[in-house]
Design a protein with these regions (language model features):
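Short coil/turn linking the two alpha-helices of tandem helical-hairpin repeats
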Residues: 143-145, 150, 188, 219-228, ...
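Active/binding-pocket-proximal capping segment
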Residues: 393-397, 409-425
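C-terminal motif of bacterial Sec signal peptides marking the signal peptidase cleavage site
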Residues: 15-16
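Elongated scaffold/linker segments in the mid-to-C-terminal portions of large proteins
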Residues: 38-40, 45, 49, 53-56, ...
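Short, surface-exposed recognition loops and adjoining beta-strand edges that mediate ligand/DNA contacts
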Residues: 59-70, 185-207, 222-302, 425-440, ...
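Sec-dependent N-terminal signal peptides
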Residues: 4-12
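Conserved, well-structured interaction surfaces
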Residues: 35-56, 76-146, 158-171, 175-192, ...
């Protein structure tokens, strides 16, 4: 249904005096009086959805820039690319902390008060499931961005909080995601308060909760190994496999691979359209300003011909550039993803020496904004597509990754399921003898610019971090090397992979502590 999108257009920070973020926590009477019927709960949930859509994985998360695959970068993004820690400590990406806790607050408001509203038990479970899922997703974001983080008790407490260990933060996410899995129906059975079928995949479902849990357990197992923490990494990998299997076997809803990469790209390019491969999405707000419109990471590389105002030469000015020679090294010539993901015609071929770039068309339509100066000229500021958080190909490859870590031979079958659709040579192709690396590279090819690569690198451990995040890059300052190229075990334990806690979190809170690594660069 499009009703969620309509509400997002209306409600997202559009009337701050009525915003739940502006309701003071101590005003418990306001909560009690507000939740009278299900429509009131729905209203609170819509603001939660809007905040979730605006901030989960958005531009403020500088870690995504470290993971992006590109040959050339504009200087604006060189700080995260090169790990310029003094620049990053100056506030690059501070919003992730506040926005994640805004989402937690809104979810807690529903969890603590939905029972006051008059509705059936099934409908109450539906909204508790939605809020639990969103809260779990927010804590997952906090664990990945900051490691140790605050775990709030509720939406009304005014006490000061210190940070809890990263594994406790992940466990909090898991508890909420598991509650969502228990309470929510499969996507095909989701209904709104009028009884109409829900078609927006920003609503959580049993399948979305399973996908979140699959990634949570894969992440927990990986960080236990990476940081030498106490825990059962093998057990976590098996749980991730189990949740992936529920999705693949259609026991958590009906999801399946599209017939071809071209069919996938067409489905991902239809905002709000049916996409049988997609499991959970964040709704694009096509009317909002630039910050809200930036959803799909690929927008930063997408120019000609998707951008109707762009030329071949304009690709040089994109924030990130991928060279065509890199595409040729990544994909076999027969791989159907080449034609689906990239545009190639005689004009491009004839100008490769002058403009040696790949022209991305994985998402096919732009959104244009008129200049604020009053000019009639338009600028493509976004792609008309929702941000697909998880899809079936991701789940096959995540299961393969966890299986290979446990030495399970079936990992090869999961990898080849994705390769078969792409018409790529099945594993092992000539020269392939490292299944773990082959799975990582397949995720790189299949999920290109879908905001997975940074997490994929970290899950694969220190050697991958050094090789795939430790860039050397020619800049205006000369050749610069990312310190991650030489990262030590102590650097990792000190928190080099996390964003610094923003200064605002320390205001009137003597319990807050900075991540040890960042004490080299900040005084708070």
């Amino acid at each position: 249904m499009n009703r969620l999108l309509i509400i997002l257009l209306i409600s997202f920070l559009g009337s701050s005096c009525e915003s739940w973020l502006d309701v003071k926590p101590e005003n418990q009477v306001t909560y009690t009086n507000f939740f009278e019927d299900e429509k009131d709960v729905e209203g609170a949930a819509f603001e939660m959805f809007a905040t979730e859509a605006a901030y989960i994985g958005c531009e403020g998360d500088y870690l995504k820039w470290q993971g992006i695959l590109a040959d050339e970068w504009s200087d604006t993004y060189n700080a995260p690319r090169l790990g310029r820690f003094s620049d990053l400590a100056g506030g690059w990406g501070d919003g992730g902390w506040k926005h994640s806790y805004d989402i937690v607050f809104l979810a807690n408001t529903i969890l603590e008060n939905a029972h006051r509203a008059s509705m059936s038990k099934d409908r109450l479970n539906f909204w508790i499931g939605q809020a639990s899922f969103t809260k779990g997703l927010a804590y997952f974001e906090l664990a990945r961005l900051y490691g140790d983080a605050v775990i709030t008790k509720n939406s009304t407490s005014l006490e000061k909080y210190g940070r809890k260990p990263m594994l406790e933060v992940i466990d909090t996410a898991i508890v909420n995601a598991e509650r969502a899995y228990r309470l929510l129906p499969v996507f095909e059975e989701l209904k709104d308060l009028s009884g109409a079928a829900i078609t927006s995949k920003q609503y959580a479902s049993k399948g979305a909760a399973a996908a979140l849990l699959a990634h949570l357990y894969a992440w927990r197992g990986s960080v236990i190994e990476l940081y030498g923490l106490t825990g059962d990494a093998a057990g976590d990998y098996q749980k991730s496999i189990d949740y992936c299997t529920l999705i693949i076997d259609k026991k958590a809803g009906f999801y399946e691979l599209h017939s071809s990469p071209e069919a996938l790209c067409q489905a991902m390019s239809k905002m709000g359209g049916e996409n049988k491969e997609s499991i959970f999405e964040l709704e694009l707000n096509p009317k909002e300003d630039y910050a809200q419109a930036v959803r799909v990471l690929g927008v930063f590389l997408t120019g000609y011909p998707v951008n109707v105002n762009a030329t071949l030469a304009a690709q040089k000015s994109r924030s990130f550039r991928l060279k065509w020679t890199t595409v040729e090294q990544m994909y076999e010539a027969k791989d159907k993803r080449v034609d689906a993901y990239f545009y190639l015609d005689d004009e491009i071929l004839n100008n490769l020496q002058t403009y040696p770039y790949a022209y991305l068309r994985k998402w096919r339509e732009g959104i244009y904004f008129t200049s604020s100066s009053g000019s009639s000229e338009t600028t493509m500021g976004a792609l008309r597509a929702n941000q697909v958080q998880w899809r079936v190909a991701d789940i096959y490859l995540l299961r393969a990754e966890c299986r290979v870590k446990l030495g399970i031979a079936d990992a090869k079958d999961d990898l080849n399921k994705v390769r078969t659709r792409a018409n790529a040579t099945l594993y092992p192709a000539v020269g392939e003898n490292d299944l773990k690396l082959a799975i990582f590279k397949e995720r790189e090819r299949e999920l290109l610019y879908e905001n997975h690569r940074y997490a994929d690198i970290v899950r694969n451990g220190k050697t991958y971090i050094q090789k795939y995040l430790g860039y050397s890059l020619a800049t205006d300052k000369g050749l610069e090397e990312n310190a991650l190229k030489y990262v030590t075990d102590q650097d990792l334990k000190d928190g080099i992979l996390f964003q610094p806690i923003p200064e605002s979190a320390f205001l009137m809170n003597g319990l807050m502590r900075q991540t040890p690594f960042w004490l080299r660069y900040v005084k708070y």
